[in-house]
Amino acid sequence: MIPDVSTALSWLEANPQALKGIRRGVEREGLRINANGSLAQTPHPESLGSALTHKWITTDFAEALLEFITPVDDDIDHMLTLLRDIHRYVARRLGDERLWPMSMPCFIDSAQPIELAQYGSSNIGRMKTLYRKGLKNRYSALMQVIAGVHYNFSLPLAFWQAYAGIRDEASGKEAISAGYLRLIRNYYRFGWIILYLFGASPGICPSFLNGRKTDLLFEQAPSGLIYLPYATSLRLSDLGYTNKSQSQLNITFNHLDEYVRGLKQAIKTPSADYQRMGLQRGGHYLQLNTNVLQIENELYAPIRPKRVTRDDESPSDALMRGGIEYVEVRSLDINPFSPVGVDEEQARFLDLFLIWCTLAEAPEMSAEELRCTRTNWNRVILEGRKPGLMLGIDCGSTEQPLTILGKSLFSDLRRVAETLDSNNGDTHYQLVCDKLVAGFDNPELTLSARFMDQLIEHGIGGLGLILANDYRQTLRDEPLQVLNEAQLDEERLRSWQRQRSLEVADHLSFDEFLASQNGR
């Protein structure tokens, strides 16, 4: 059932100014490919700066997996224009390479080398590469080059002052953290709606399976595309990045100290599987350690509570110091119809949904219920557009049609949209609501359905190259709008200076450094 939020919505409508100053940021991943679609084997271009220290342009798992990061912004249009500027700058410096425009990779098989991201000779740079080596050995490299979009979101202090009655961030950090944890619990219960609306990986390249066993009953198009007819986001299925050893972790989102305690336990709990793998072979490290998680970021989660860390501070220590500062939403596939992988409609919907998640009551959630929510997510992932699809309520004790749940949720979201629009003197959020809600009566309007039509017509490889070539030319031709070449060139030079400073400042051997990090 959708919780009753009428009282909270009435409060919001009486206090619209509480939503002025929402802050957001986007992180977009994208694989560098050659003109024929194969994975680029070149190093991260020096002309883009240091992947270790650049503020806006870095790499994720692989040397070829770029990641673009926008600064925190209180204006969606400005944020997306800045993201596009970064793409424009990069497109002009990739030579004949381009970005693969979707989440699921293609033209890659298990025999093709996937170079781990390299970050220089500093201890911290070597540790980042070794962490990725551990991921490769634990889950395979192919799983790690699946790309996505992360959306970082925080409500303004004025909201928490009005809603929770706090004075300032420092004295009110417990109330703010409790509010964000409520958001996260509701996200687990209802976040399947993001996959329904914006899932964009309903099919995969045959090479992605490459003999792997699966229970999924795939169909195959004449183009070779392997797909499930009603799927939304195979990226988030068991085909994608999962960690079976994590399924036994009892990490919950009811209280911040509980969450941090569970996370810290996971990075100190030995794994029999990873102990058998070994820490070193032939004098070379295979992973950072043999625990269930090498570091906290290895925890698979569709949403994370976050705080900006200080130097040499772990994510969980930062949370305990200052409380939750923002949430990181990790459930967005690359939008193949956007040159930058995400669009304004998606950002506005996420604003609405995350505000709703903050306002709606969210009873505490046991580890068992947390696992139960995965059932609904899996149904939407694998057959979200199936007519008459039912979703479980209260761990499956009852069921309701997805369409009924979705439309009920949108009736609340539209009230949030009206409040946000009243602050801005326009109707942007309401228009997004009106457009997206139509997808519940007409599943063919969803992103996965529209993408599937194109995939079946062109094949995933053919369509990927059509879009990649189109976006490459478009971005190369467009002038920068928010940033300028001089700013980006300066950040490139400064990033190399910062990397060199880290390298000369090291006073521990790598073995000593690693021991100090594992002992924290």
Swiss-Prot record:
> Carries keyword Nucleotide-binding?
yes
Q: What's an example GO cellular component term for this entry? A: cytosol
Name the Gene3D superfamilies for this protein.
3.30.590.20
According to its UniProt entry, the protein's GO biological process terms are: glutathione biosynthetic process
This enzyme catalyses: L-cysteine + L-glutamate + ATP = gamma-L-glutamyl-L-cysteine + ADP + phosphate + H(+)
List all disulphide bridges recorded for this chain.
none
Question: What is the designated name of this protein?
Answer: Glutamate--cysteine ligase
Cite the EC number: 6.3.2.2
Q: Alphabetically list the UniProt keywords.
A: ATP-binding, Glutathione biosynthesis, Ligase, Nucleotide-binding
Q: Which GO terms describe its molecular function?
A: ATP binding; glutamate-cysteine ligase activity; metal ion binding
Q: Does the keyword rRNA-binding apply?
A: no
Task: Give the pathway listed in the UniProt entry for this protein.
Answer: Sulfur metabolism; glutathione biosynthesis; glutathione from L-cysteine and L-glutamate: step 1/2
- What family is reported? Belongs to the glutamate--cysteine ligase type 1 family. Type 1 subfamily.
| Top-rank EC class of the record's enzyme | ligase
